[in-house]
Regions:
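Hydrophobic, aromatic-rich transmembrane alpha-helices
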Residues: 124, 128-131, 250-253, 400-409, ...
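Membrane-lumen/periplasm interface segments of specific transmembrane helices
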Residues: 158-163, 337-423
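Short hydrophobic/aromatic helix or loop-helix immediately within or flanking a transmembrane segment
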Residues: 196-229, 235, 239
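Transmembrane-helix motifs of polytopic, lipid-linked glycan transferases
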Residues: 236-257, 433
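Transmembrane-helix signature of polytopic, membrane-embedded enzymes
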Residues: 250-272, 445
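Specific aromatic-rich, kink-prone transmembrane helix
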Residues: 276, 288-305
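Short acidic/glycine- and proline-prone juxtamembrane loop motifs at membrane-interface regions
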Residues: 281-287
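Membrane-interface alpha helices of multi-pass inner-membrane proteins
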Residues: 305-335, 339, 507
Length: 533
């Protein structure tokens, strides 16, 4: 039943993206692998754990799977009704009502069959996420939980107000409007719920599996909100995205400190950092990728048994997150290599099991498209200019500029970097000092490696520099720059300078909020003026 259900889902997902033909090789490989894993190895430990229904997450899993399949079915319905075959049937005297009824019944039947398999997968993912989070929850601390809830509520109010006044952050009719984001395409194609959507390429091979367990419920919420707002679905997506963002920040605060007040201040500071403010509104893939990356960090620090699952989830959300595999614990290099190799094979098996063999069958074209973003025409010095500015962007919003896109519409983006950013260099020096001071901390080591990875990816390789759009990656990397600083404040607190530590964080919160809210208002004025609802 599970094999049949998942096979139907993969087939429906392929049809929703324009037909099965180009996905046939992947689907054949997928059904074969699933048949082996589910039918032949029906008594395996993995299969048994997959089918365990977790009551904590079961209802959410069912709701998210229902939302995901509603989205897929709705896409197929409109595709079928606009096809030439329908016109031919109507010309033969078959009424539109009859055709609609047949199509709806067929889609409902297939969706019902697929729902079982999707619910099982979503439940497996969510139950492991919740179980991992439970390992770091300390019930005696409550203020930081209240702070996180308040921040989330403020984000919700902000989303509703902004989305009622502008379309710039989700549906302006153009991509690149806000800091080079593809929000328009992502929202219009429901990228979070689409297994084969074009944006879910080699960079995010199984992005849907990491996002849909959360975003599926947003689709159902969006249907309800559409009764009150013309952009109800976008608001629902933004709600869940903001929830994942705050959840990630809350997790980071728990990794950094065991003090309730310090945790609360960390949540407040990170919530008003410029990347967090922008991505609380801008519908993008990076928020859920950021969430899964933090989950991978939690796993390698607290539960190595779940490390493989979280690293695979993070890598499917954004392939570069596979870098976290270097932090898998082992007694020797050989043991680590075997463990990393096993994780890599599991990643590929998951990829093929869910029909994404097409990514490797078209690997040359996929790589060519990806490497066009690397700024091959720029010198290493030009890339360093942009990177030094990017470091500052991870903390505060620098004055952005209104520009004219090459296609003629107005966009809001980073100003050109023609020299080294002094503030960025100062921050890097301070971060290096903080890393040295906290070098015994595993979290500090992980964040230091992630900073080094950002230098390699953004500065040396020059990812995103061709379009001067490094800000898009600020949320994904900024946490690593913040961690050594917060760990230093925690050490100051532990040494007995409690008031000093709290005063430093409080002043920093006020300062960061002042700068970032001012820049945010400038961006908002641009959005409302040029892209009103």
């Amino acid at each position: 039943m599970l094999w049949c259900s998942l096979s139907v889902f993969i087939g429906l997902s392929a049809i929703s993206q324009g037909g099965v033909t180009r996905f046939i090789p992947g689907i054949l490989v997928s059904t074969t692998i699933l048949f082996y894993l589910i039918v032949i190895r029906a008594n395996s430990v993995t299969y048994s754990s997959l089918k365990q229904f977790n009551t904590k997450t079961g209802v959410l899993s069912i709701a998210s799977s229902a939302g995901t399949l509603c989205c897929v079915a709705d896409t197929i319905y409109h595709m079928v009704m606009k096809s030439g075959a329908i016109s031919k049937l109507m010309s033969k005297g078959i009424s539109t009502t009859t055709i609609q009824a047949v199509v709806v019944i067929a889609l409902l039947t297939m969706s019902f069959i697929a729902m079982y398999g999707v619910s099982v997968i979503f439940n497996y993912i969510l139950s492991n996420v919740v179980a991992l989070i439970d390992t770091i929850i300390d019930n005696k601390y409550e203020i930081n939980n209240i702070v996180a809830i308040v921040v989330c509520a403020l984000y919700f109010f902000l989303i509703v107000w902004v989305y009622r006044n502008t379309t710039a952050f989700y549906g302006s009719g153009y991509n690149d409007v806000i800091y080079g984001s593809d929000s328009y395409t992502l929202t219009g194609s429901n990228v979070w719920l689409s297994l084969f959507q074009g944006q879910n390429d080699l960079r995010q091979p199984l992005y849907m599996l990491t996002a849909a367990p959360f975003m599926g419920i947003a689709y159902i919420l969006g249907i309800i909100l559409n009764c009150f707002y013309v952009n109800g679905l976008a608001i629902a997506y933004a709600f869940v995205q903001a929830l994942l963002l705050v959840w990630s920040i809350w997790l980071l605060s728990h990794l950094i400190s065991n003090n309730d007040i310090i945790r609360s201040l960390i949540i407040l500071i990170l919530s008003v950092s410029y990347p967090a403010i922008v991505f609380s509104l801008c519908l993008e893939q990076y928020v859920s990728s950021f969430f899964w990356l933090i989950m991978a960090v939690v796993a390698v620090m607290y539960d190595q048994k779940k490390a493989d699952l979280m690293i695979i989830g993070a890598a499917n959300g954004l392939l570069t997150s596979a870098f976290m595999v270097v932090w898998k614990r082992a007694k020797s290099f050989v043991e680590w290599f075997q463990s990393a190799f096993k994780c890599g094979m599991m990643f590929l098996l998951t990829l093929f099991a869910f029909g994404r063999a097409d990514i490797f069958l078209n690997i040359k074209a996929n790589l060519a498209e990806i490497f066009q973003h690397t700024g091959k025409k720029l010198t290493i010095v030009d890339k360093a200019y942009q990177y030094s500015k990017f470091v500052v962007d991870c903390f505060v919003g620098q004055p952005a500029v209104e520009k004219v896109h090459k296609s003629g519409f107005l966009i809001w983006g980073s100003s050109e970097s023609t020299t080294i950013n002094v503030a960025g260099v100062i921050i890097i020096v301070l971060i290096v000092i903080a890393i040295i001071w906290n070098r015994e901390s595993l979290l500090c080591k992980i964040s230091a490696s992630w900073i080094g990875f950002s230098v390699l990816l953004l500065c040396v390789l020059g990812w995103g520099t061709s379009s001067n759009a490094l800000f898009l990656y600020s949320l994904y990397f900024s946490w690593a720059f913040w961690v050594p600083f917060f760990l230093s404040i925690q050490r100051i607190y532990n040494k007995g300078y409690k008031k000093s530590a709290i005063v430093i964080l409080t002043c920093l919160f006020i300062l960061i909020a002042k700068f970032n809210i001012a820049e945010f208002i400038r961006m908002l004025n641009f959005a409302i003026e040029n892209y009103p609802l």
